[in-house]
A protein has these predicted regions:
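Phosphate/dinucleotide-binding and metal-coordinating scaffold of catalytic cores
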Residues: 1-295, 299-377
């Protein structure tokens, strides 16, 4: 099959610009004239609003700028696509990165859409969460699942490693997660308990729920923050992960919370609420043993009306380890065993008072120890 060499990028049916495959397999981008006149920079540090052709300098986003790589699915979605293509006698290697963005089309996270989109099958509606979970396990264990089309339709363009679906509940958009094959059965209950604790610690999160199950303690669900209802219409929000903003490979430890705090201050124009919330997240991740705190787990949302970037609600807060036994993002240079000393140092350097940093860190430590003790033993 011939691979696609260019693709339109749109937002709310407005042409943002064009992606084009170069001879050295990088994907160049240029803004449309309309967007240059009425739009905004979709990636402030990498793609300023200028009339020029931008070419990525790094290779680890498959030749894309980070903002467009954010639209591609992570491990679970990639696995589903690979299985779906194999079932149809095709190989993923036959598809360029632009082909994969075309498959994402209008179904990706955030506000960017890709055209012309490529349909690869829709499947039939499945409403039973336990049934979906069982089929997810079949996929993870390399077994055949007759519901592959439906699993891809529901979760093939999502981020993250764990199986999940994106679905509508009472007119609102939700993400519901299922256990991976290495997870304990209570992984959904644990993430739900973590979300309640995080909220008690003053961390901003979307609404969360524990969906009932007959085969496990429940499935964790969270309302999507990249979708909102406005005048009876679903509006999409443009967003960027820290990995995309800084053009970083999130699989490699390459960031310190000092830099994440600085990024938050610069991007949000020193919004006190967001800077303090980032500090709380850092404290929570340390005390609640969330070591998989990589740069795709921090996101910023753009408000076009106010021309403002804001820190998104927190997500993926749960007990986690890394294969190297440390936090993915170091705390004042310490990834192995950071404590209050390092946390306060990060907060103070970000411009917060030492007494405030000490008080917040201690409050979060006590709250975590009280509410999550059974997970941390």
């Amino acid at each position: 099959m011939s691979q696609r060499e260019s693709l339109e990028v749109r937002m709310d049916d407005r042409l943002v610009g064009t992606l084009a495959l170069t001879a050295n397999h990088k994907v160049a981008f240029s803004y449309s004239e309309e967007w240059l006149e009425h739009g905004f920079s979709v990636s402030p540090f990498s793609l300023p609003l200028k009339n020029e052709v931008f070419v990525p300098k790094k290779d680890y986003f498959d030749g894309l700028f980070g903002v467009f790589a954010d639209s591609l699915p992570d491990a679970w979605g990639q696995l589903l696509l690979e299985r779906l293509l194999k079932e149809r006698g095709k190989k993923e290697a036959q598809y360029s990165v632009l082909d994969r963005l075309a498959i994402v089309g209008k179904s990706g996270m955030g506000a960017l859409t890709y055209h012309p989109q490529k349909e690869i099958g829709m499947g039939q509606q499945m409403d039973d969460l336990d049934e979906l979970s069982v089929h997810c396990q079949k996929i993870l264990s390399t077994q055949y699942s007759e519901k592959l089309d439906e699993l891809y339709r529901l979760g093939g363009t999502s981020g993250g490693a764990r199986p999940k679906i994106m679905t509508e509940i009472d007119g609102e958009n939700w993400i519901i997660k299922f256990p991976a094959h290495v997870d304990k059965k209570d992984v959904g209950k644990m993430e739900y308990d973590y979300s309640l604790c995080a909220k008690a610690c003053g961390i901003v999160m979307s609404e969360t729920r524990l969906f009932s199950s007959d085969i496990c303690p429940g499935y964790f669900g969270t309302k999507r923050f990249d979708r909102r209802i406005e005048k009876n219409e679903i509006k999409r929000a443009h967003m960027l992960t820290a990995a995309a903003l800084l053009e970083l490979d999130f699989n490699q430890p390459s960031l310190d919370y000092h830099e994440l705090m600085k990024l938050t201050k610069i991007l949000t124009r020193d919004c006190t609420e967001d800077v303090e919330n980032m500090y709380r997240r850092m404290c929570f991740n340390v005390f609640a043993h969330n070591r998989d705190d990589h740069s795709k787990n921090f996101t910023y949302i753009y408000n076009e009306k106010d021309d403002m970037w804001r820190l998104s609600p927190a997500y993926d807060l749960t007990y986690s380890n890394t294969y190297y036994g440390e936090h993915t993002i170091t705390v004042d240079g310490n990834g192995k065993n950071p404590g209050k000393k390092e946390l306060v140092a990060v907060g103070v350097q970000a411009g917060m008072k030492k007494t405030y940093c000490e008080r917040v860190a201690e409050e979060i430590r006590l709250c975590v120890n009280e509410k999550l003790e059974h997970y941390l033993k």
